[in-house]
């Protein structure tokens, strides 16, 4: 059996993620107390369900604290358990609650949305350590659905390398394990003819392909990842996220990420271009 747990901050897109899994054929349950997971999984096994997705968050109350032990117990039963932790920048969450006019689940008399977000972050600190983080601050609903499906489709028994480009002007992604800054490299943005393209397009590839500094940065990042990857593999991690940023997240970082992904193509690799997904 396979169990995907969806957790994270309110307003970060957990409902979108759960619906994406439902569309992919998972039997989905929203807001099940952590302590009820073993009993529920035994029942789903009797029913013949193989792919289960369940959201577990602060609505579970005190039982949330038992989640780490519950997850370990399910794994010892041979269940493939993975947890996706969705989050976003506080200012993004505040804006989302304002736009939707929804009430934060932890808000009450005298507690602001900002304070509710901080409280929820504290309550979920231990849960965050259990899973793969997805920063949805700059993601559209369609992009989030796509990312969730890709993560779930990856082989959970192998370490997945996630290569992610981003723009510093939009903020550093919170879900990155490594962050590299490519803003020191030549920027094709200042050439009006190159500006409309991205790092995946031939004109930008030609622009960078003969540049020594660009080649050296790619080689250095590649060497560092190759050196330390076995160490991270020993931690029984499912995912390792390597992020490269430039100013806007359109040219330099995209080009470098594409090259790194090709360099590690013999491994399980996922590619994300955070700013290219913003409008899709």
Swiss-Prot record:
UniProtKB keywords: ATP-binding, GTP-binding, Nucleotide-binding
SUPFAM superfamilies: P-loop containing nucleoside triphosphate hydrolases (SSF52540)
Residues that hold ATP according to the record: 8-15
One of the record's GO molecular function terms: GTP binding
Binding-site residues, GTP: 57-60
Domain of life: Bacteria
Similarity comment: Belongs to the RapZ-like family.
Entry function: Displays ATPase and GTPase activities.
PANTHER family assigned: RNASE ADAPTER PROTEIN RAPZ
Identification of the protein by name: Nucleotide-binding protein CV_3336
